């Protein structure tokens, strides 16, 4: 029976979600508290990954990161026709390991559209990180945090480049 308890413990650790313990990114720019000359945006985040067991957590990380980094923006979940829409389509957010190194990746596509539905910008944001499996550290979480920070940095740069005339 003791042998089976170790098996269950190993399975629980191996099947844990890579988003666990990852914190939202906060990178506000006092010169650009919101983007595109608008204060309110509709925000739609969809998870297109094959494995979606941690969807609420990952979507929350992305939403919180945008809110903290663009504190002048108000975000609406409902598609209000008078607001532009920022859409994020999540493709990868996870880690793999060979036992010695953790590989983390975050990847999503971003679109910003004006209230008429015209595309203002579209781009891909990716982040990748490798981290040796150090003892006494959650190397999986550290690698995933770095990948999120890189992908969110690209997202913010792309959104902040929006013209204020849109």
Question: Where do the model's predicted regions map?
Answer:
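Sec-dependent bacterial lipoprotein signal peptides
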Residues: 1-13
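A structural "domain/chain start" motif
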Residues: 15-68, 160-166
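Surface-exposed short loop/turn segments
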Residues: 17-21, 73, 80-122, 126-138, ...
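Flexible, charged surface loops at secondary-structure boundaries
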Residues: 34-36, 78-82
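Short secondary-structure boundary motifs at beta->alpha junctions and helix caps
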Residues: 50-56, 114-165
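Short glycine-aromatic motifs
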Residues: 75-77, 161
